[in-house]
């Protein structure tokens, strides 16, 4: 999930590692994100949790588990305005819950960043596109990753062979080394 997922999968294949450094199913990444969020809330006396997301389920999860906590959301200018504005308007807190940022930088750094965001958020499966599809109902937008995971026959995505297996049955993938 996210802008670097494809490159992490590709690098794992190039290096011929035993397993991928990222989850091969989005729902597993979502569940991991939720577990990390709970850990941030647990240590709130040492840190100030800030959650950058435009996923409606993730936002609802944070709102529910952060009811009695102080935190903030973060989003890129122009992304998920409607849902973040809703939470800001209807929250019972006396502070602004969403920090909006606009990326800045030199051309060589900024353009690749913006392209990754465009690719990530332009995907047909992205929350941003789902939110703007009037044919989808709320249950198709708010997807509980635990329910999704419970329906899997196996945790590993069967559509993505492990790095050593990408050339099977012809041959096993070799180990790669970054010289």
Predicted regions mapped to residue ranges:
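Positively charged, amphipathic and often flexible ligand-engagement surfaces
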Residues: 1-173
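Short, intrinsically disordered, charge-balanced linker/junction segments flanking boundaries
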Residues: 174-179
């Amino acid at each position: 999930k996210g802008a670097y997922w494809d490159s992490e999968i590709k690098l794992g294949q190039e290096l011929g590692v035993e397993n991928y450094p990222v989850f091969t199913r989005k729902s597993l990444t979502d569940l991991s994100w939720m577990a990390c969020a709970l850990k941030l809330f647990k240590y709130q006396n040492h840190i100030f949790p800030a959650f950058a997301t435009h996923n409606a389920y993730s936002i609802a999860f944070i709102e529910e588990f952060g009811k009695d906590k102080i935190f903030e959301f973060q989003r890129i200018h122009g992304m998920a305005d409607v849902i973040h504005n809703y939470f800001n308007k209807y929250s019972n807190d006396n502070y602004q819950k969403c920090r909006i940022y606009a990326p800045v930088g030199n051309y060589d750094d900024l353009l690749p960043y913006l392209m990754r965001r465009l690719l990530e958020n332009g995907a047909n499966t992205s929350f941003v596109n789902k939110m703007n599809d009037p044919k989808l109902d709320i249950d198709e937008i708010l997807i509980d990753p635990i329910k999704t995971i419970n329906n899997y026959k196996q945790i590993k995505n069967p559509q993505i062979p492990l790095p050593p297996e990408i050339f099977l049955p012809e041959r096993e993938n070799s180990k790669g080394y970054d010289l």
